Amino acid sequence: LKVVIGRDARISGPMIHNLVVNTLVGLGIDVIDLGLSTTPTVEIAVPMEKADGGIILTASHNPKQWNALKLLNAKGEFLSGADGAKILEIAEAEAFDFADVDSLGEVTENHAYMDIHIDEVLELPLVDADLVKTKKFKVVVDGVNSSGGIIIPNLLEQMGVEVVKLYCEPNGHFPHNPEPLKEHLGDICKLVVEEKADFGIVVDPDVDRLAFISNDGEMFGEEYTLVAVADYVLSKNPGNTVSNMSSSRALRDITEKH
């Protein structure tokens, strides 16, 4: 068996990382260790590595004292409720055996996956990096002092964007509540206006949520972000959309428009 592991920059991350990796090794499972990473990066790494699953060590947008495990299947997708229940059942019953010393798992470090992820994004047919370069955008990025402070500026800079970094040191000391809600984003809203930036980007610690700030310092809500992206994608590739109950009616309207 082989499992891909990545973590956000939480202060407890190295401790939890050592615990999880060494437990897997003790069970005879090989580990591909991505080090500091993002949830979407681990998701793409699992099938690329032909791994049996993945684990992201993160508590997502929860405050810094939290930490947890996000579990992925061999497709790099989150486990179903049924599979999650099986994992808990095995753990609670302690229905597992550690490997003998000749059958321990091996750890392989691969810290290239954030760069690989960026390359994959830039190669998407719907991403026109050359067009973005002609616009000479200036963008403020709030990485909440986690791994988003690495990957988001690097992606933007490869598209010719001038990046103003705010809280982009991956030290795990979150300068504000990491959930990207309006009431937590006063600093970036102010900086976007001060820097005369075109817009701002805020991500949560494991970079599976983001919010945009307009050039006037006002938040461009998550529901509008989804609709704007869907409008662009459907204009190039007409089709259907699937959403959850928290999505606005606007997504349905945009889908029907195309």
Annotated model-derived regions:
Residues 1-8, 138-140, 239-245:
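Short glycine-rich phosphate-binding loop at a beta-alpha junction
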Residues 2-66, 154-213:
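N-terminal small/polar loop signature for handling phosphorylated ligands or for N-terminal nucleophile
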Residues 7-8, 36, 57-60, 69, ...:
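Fold-independent oxyanion-binding glycine-rich loops
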Residues 13-18, 84, 149-153, 252:
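Short, surface-exposed alpha-helical segments at coil->helix boundaries
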Residues 41, 85-119, 123, 214-258:
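Proline/glycine-rich low-complexity loops and linkers
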Residues 67-195:
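Gly/Ser/Thr-enriched, mixed-charge loops and adjacent short helices
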